[in-house]
């Protein structure tokens, strides 16, 4: 059985959808506070449909509480931290029964200190470079070049949202996947690698 961990999720419908995915795959859902909603929120339950009452879900007071109650260390080999900042893709990882797939909040992802403490456990879902996937890509590439910044410079990062998307207040577009979609992609790869147990 796999474990889906949502660190500070903010959008109730995403958590409801992920809960539904957990039920139909036999995964456990772990919610690390703070949550951006109440679990009694009708949007959570609506997104989970009739599955919510069958969900194995645990809520934690914070990251340390989550680690302690599950007998994990910050860089435990059972942890897989999903972030756009990783070099290794999720498909390059090996998943084993009982692993924890950790996803950050919709607006800010997994906090930098947690990523730094487990840098070898970080994975990403491949996507087009942000500037390649945006309609205004050429304008933003030219803007960055005119400022003399590379995509890794501090100034360039400050003009990106937490997922690395360039922010143009007059023409904002998003090139990151939805949290629920991201969770399903990685969970089903883990299930594929383990032979879809019980399915």
Regions found by a protein language model. Name each.
Residues 1-199:
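Post-transcriptional modification and biogenesis factors for structured RNAs
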């Amino acid at each position: 059985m796999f474990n889906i961990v949502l660190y500070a999720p903010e959008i109730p419908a995403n958590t409801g959808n992920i809960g539904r995915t957990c039920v139909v795959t036999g995964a456990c859902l772990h919610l690390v506070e703070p949550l951006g909603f109440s679990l009694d929120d009708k949007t959570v339950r609506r997104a989970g449909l009739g599955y919510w009452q069958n969900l194995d879900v645990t809520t934690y007071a914070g990251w340390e509480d989550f680690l302690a109650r599950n007998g994990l260390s910050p860089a435990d080999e059972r942890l897989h931290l999903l972030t756009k900042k990783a070099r290794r893709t999720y498909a390059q990882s090996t998943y084993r029964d009982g692993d924890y797939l950790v996803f950050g909040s919709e607006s800010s992802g997994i906090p930098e200190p947690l990523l730094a403490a487990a840098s070898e456990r970080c994975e990403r879902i491949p996507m087009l470079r942000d500037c390649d996937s945006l309609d205004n890509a050429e304008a933003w590439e030219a803007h960055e070049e005119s400022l003399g910044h590379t995509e890794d410079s501090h100034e360039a990062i400050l003009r990106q949202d937490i997922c690395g998307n360039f922010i143009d207040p007059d023409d904002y577009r998003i090139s990151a996947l939805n949290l629920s979609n991201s969770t399903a992609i990685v969970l089903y790869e883990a299930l594929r690698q383990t032979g879809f147990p019980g399915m």
